[in-house]
């Protein structure tokens, strides 16, 4: 099993458990160059809030979009947007990525900005 297949297998298992809970989830995806975050409704078919380093407003503030500082900026932005929509509590879906580095930086920044998970 290659690295990508193993990550997808981990993500599928975690998503199955989160679906049983019926909670709003904060989904994170990372690539070497960018990081993306979405808040998805409990039914799984509606994206309530999104933020990423691809967005011009976030990317202009950054020197490079693929590091911890960029992830923290996305985490802060996603939390602010979620709180504006009245979403305070989410379940964290790391998409099979290790909770370390950029994924952890995004989660910590979102917590500091007021999102609970």
Curated annotation (Swiss-Prot):
SUPFAM superfamilies (UniProt xref):
Translational machinery components
Q: Which UniProt keywords apply?
A: Ribonucleoprotein, Ribosomal protein, RNA-binding, rRNA-binding
User: Which InterPro entries does this entry report, sorted A to Z?
Assistant: Ribosomal_uL18_bac-type, Ribosomal_uL18_bac/euk
Q: Does the keyword Ribosomal protein apply?
A: yes
Q: Which residues form the signal peptide?
A: none
User: GO CC terms on record?
Assistant: cytosolic large ribosomal subunit
* Protein's UniProt keywords contain Nucleus: no
Q: Which gene encodes it?
A: rplR
User: Which stretches are annotated as coiled coil?
Assistant: none
Q: GO MF terms on file?
A: 5S rRNA binding; structural constituent of ribosome
Query: What's this protein's name?
Result: Large ribosomal subunit protein uL18
Q: Which family does it belong to?
A: Belongs to the universal ribosomal protein uL18 family.
Oligomer and partners: Part of the 50S ribosomal subunit; part of the 5S rRNA/L5/L18/L25 subcomplex. Contacts the 5S and 23S rRNAs.
- Biological function: This is one of the proteins that bind and probably mediate the attachment of the 5S RNA into the large ribosomal subunit, where it forms part of the central protuberance.
A biological process term (GO) from this entry = translation
């Amino acid at each position: 099993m290659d690295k990508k297949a193993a990550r997808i297998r981990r993500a599928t298992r975690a998503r199955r458990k989160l679906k049983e809970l019926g909670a709003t989830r904060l989904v994170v995806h990372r690539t070497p160059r960018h990081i993306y975050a979405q808040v998805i409704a409990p039914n799984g078919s509606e994206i309530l809030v999104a933020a990423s380093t691809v967005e011009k407003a976030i990317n202009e503030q950054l020197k490079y979009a693929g590091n911890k500082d960029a992830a923290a900026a996305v985490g802060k932005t996603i939390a602010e947007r979620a709180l504006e929509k009245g979403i305070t509590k989410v379940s964290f879906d790391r998409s099979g990525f290790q909770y370390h580095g950029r994924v952890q930086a995004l989660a910590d920044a979102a917590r500091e900005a007021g999102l609970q998970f």
